[in-house]
């Protein structure tokens, strides 16, 4: 793959359509209005010296965006480099005067960007995170040129850190176990990696918000969230990214998640409602109090929902707690306080629909798991800001929270096993979350329903509906359209019904066209 073929510039715009002059930025004769379309994919470009937490931010941000339903993927340049150079020798590979290595590193960047393009155009990706140092203006300009040619938005995230303790801790926690350093002792790894950082410092050009980079969209994160500098945020997604990055921290803490004690409705097999604790539920609450006292957790906060069963569980702890309405259990609408057998008898169609696509299914007059994720987003933001915390919630709520911390997709989320009287201890680590389950030896009923094993033919899959408004969410016969209009061309006109039918039935349609996802 050559550089010229990767970043070719279109020679002319569509001759049959001449748009009026506008004040939009243009690159040569290329019409660039498409890069400002609201639904254009966004390329997040990380910037910073090694050991500044770029990969930590990349993975965490990707996990959050996927959780809220925005298809996102990380492209780590280190992975591409290790594919190209199988054996890492020393920091000499990163010297700016090592011409052969510089060519390899640039070629790896080009290959990664081509994969970004394929992800956007062929896999319906919405956001790609380009995880690399990108410390020179030359490299960043190359990325900007690539994005303009393909009508992608660009948002830079620069991580700046001058705290030697933070840098050293990052090297020891993450880099010692890096594939670059197999079977090496810590002292040698630290020495080599510090020299690698010095190689990057020679050519490092930070973002310049006052002059050279004043027109770019970016956020500078200084000393792991001590200060922030935000410049020219373009859209809703970028504002959400900024808000998220301003809430996360890296201080050690533990998050405890558990459901309320067994309730009277749990014993009857009923869903929803606002029943109190059973005898065994009260036993669990006392066992939970004893467990927390033994742990001697400093400055522990306790959150509950506003439903009776979580409040009664927290009351037994003898500590201050906060009630959150948004932690209430999923709203089952007309099915509240019914057993699954009763739902199947009274609403057989609804029962079958929920089994087909549990994440998207919305109870009539109630909520779906997708709705619940949106409702819980403020909880995630606050959890990211907190220290040690215990959240006493409900089965569906706990599934959503666990899916965020464990990076589980929409298919897995509604079927995560969250038993009664089990505590999940989550400890954030470098690139993920360590999970421990703690049993307090108090019996309880099993409220888990496994995923149905039967498969429905696509021809039998109904149109998904908003159950309380009967507004279609999507059609099983989606008309496929190009992800983005080609640069310089007239936006496609709406299809007539006959033409739409032709497109659905025709066998000669382009294979690379994809439907436009709604975010």
Swiss-Prot record:
Residues with the Phosphothreonine modification: 471, 478
Modified residues (Phosphoserine): 32, 469, 486, 496
Keyword Phosphoprotein among record annotations: yes
CDD domains: HP_PGM_like
Binding site for beta-D-fructose 6-phosphate: 81, 105, 133, 139, 175, 196, 200
Polar residues: compositionally biased ranges: 1-17, 456-479, 510-519
Chain residue ranges for the region called 6-phosphofructo-2-kinase: 2-251
EC code: 2.7.1.105, 3.1.3.46
Catalytic residues of the enzyme: 131, 161, 260, 329
Site features described as Transition state stabilizer, chain residue numbers: 259, 266, 394
GO biological process, any: glycolytic process
Catalysis performed (reactions): beta-D-fructose 2,6-bisphosphate + H2O = beta-D-fructose 6-phosphate + phosphate; beta-D-fructose 6-phosphate + ATP = beta-D-fructose 2,6-bisphosphate + ADP + H(+)
Residues holding ATP: 48-56, 170-175, 351-354, 395-399, 431
Record entry for activity regulation: Phosphorylation results in the activation of the kinase activity.
Assembly and binders: Homodimer. Forms a heterodimer with PFKFB3.
Family: In the C-terminal section; belongs to the phosphoglycerate mutase family.
Protein name: 6-phosphofructo-2-kinase/fructose-2,6-bisphosphatase 2
Organism: Mus musculus
Name of the gene: Pfkfb2
């Amino acid at each position: 793959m050559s550089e010229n073929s990767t970043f070719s510039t279109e020679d002319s715009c569509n001759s049959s359509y001449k748009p009026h002059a506008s004040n939009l930025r243009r690159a040569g004769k290329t019409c660039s209005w498409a890069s400002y379309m609201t639904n254009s994919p966004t390329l997040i470009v990380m910037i910073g010296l090694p050991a500044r937490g770029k990969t930590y931010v990349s993975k965490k941000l990707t996990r959050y965006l996927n959780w809220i339903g925005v298809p996102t993927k990380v492209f780590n340049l280190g992975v591409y480099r290790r594919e190209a150079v199988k054996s890492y020798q020393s920091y000499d590979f990163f010297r700016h005067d090592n011409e052969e290595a510089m060519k390899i590193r640039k070629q790896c960047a080009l290959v990664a960007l081509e994969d970004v393009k394929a992800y956007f155009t062929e896999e319906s990706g919405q956001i790609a995170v380009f995880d690399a140092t990108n410390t020179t203006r030359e490299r960043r300009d190359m990325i900007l040129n690539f994005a303009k040619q393909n009508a992608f938005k660009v948002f830079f995230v620069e991580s700046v850190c001058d705290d030697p303790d933070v840098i050293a801790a990052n090297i020891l926690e993450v880099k010692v176990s890096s594939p670059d350093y197999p079977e090496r002792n810590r002292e040698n790894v630290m020495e080599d990696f510090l020299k690698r950082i010095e190689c990057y410092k020679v050519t490092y050009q930070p973002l310049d918000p006052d002059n050279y980079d004043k027109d770019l969209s970016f956020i500078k994160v200084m000393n792991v969230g001590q200060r922030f500098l935000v410049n020219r945020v373009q859209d809703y997604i970028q504002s959400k990214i900024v808000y998220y990055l301003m809430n996360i921290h890296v201080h050690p803490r533990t998050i405890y998640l558990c459901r309320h004690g067994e309730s009277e409705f749990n014993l009857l097999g009923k869903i929803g409602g606002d029943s109190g604790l059973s005898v065994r539920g009260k036993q669990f609450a006392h066992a939970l109090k004893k467990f927390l006292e033994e742990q001697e957790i400093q400055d522990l906060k306790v959150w509950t929902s506003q439903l009776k069963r979580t409040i009664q569980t927290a009351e037994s702890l003898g500590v201050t707690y906060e009630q959150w309405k948004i932690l209430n259990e999923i709203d089952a609408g007309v099915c509240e306080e019914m057993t699954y057998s009763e739902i199947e008898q009274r609403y057989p169609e609804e029962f079958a629909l929920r089994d087909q696509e549990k994440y998207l299914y919305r109870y009539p007059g109630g909520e779906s798991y997708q709705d619940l994720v949106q409702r819980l987003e403020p909880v995630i933001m606050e959890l990211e800001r907190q220290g040690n915390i215990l959240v006493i919630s409900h089965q569906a709520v706990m599934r959503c929270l666990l899916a965020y911390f464990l990076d589980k997709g929409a298919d897995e989320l509604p079927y995560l096993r969250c038993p009664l009287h089990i505590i999940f201890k989550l400890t954030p680590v470098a690139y993920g979350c360590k999970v421990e389950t703690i049993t307090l030896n108090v019996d309880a009923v099993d409220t888990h329903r496994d995923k149905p094993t039967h498969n429905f033919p696509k021809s039998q899959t109904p149109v998904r509906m908003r159950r309380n408004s009967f507004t279609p969410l999507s059609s099983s016969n989606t008309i496929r359209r190009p992800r983005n209009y080609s640069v310089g061309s007239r936006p496609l006109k709406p299809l007539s019904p006959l033409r739409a039918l032709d497109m659905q039935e025709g066998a000669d349609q382009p294979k690379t066209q994809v439907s436009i996802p709604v975010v």
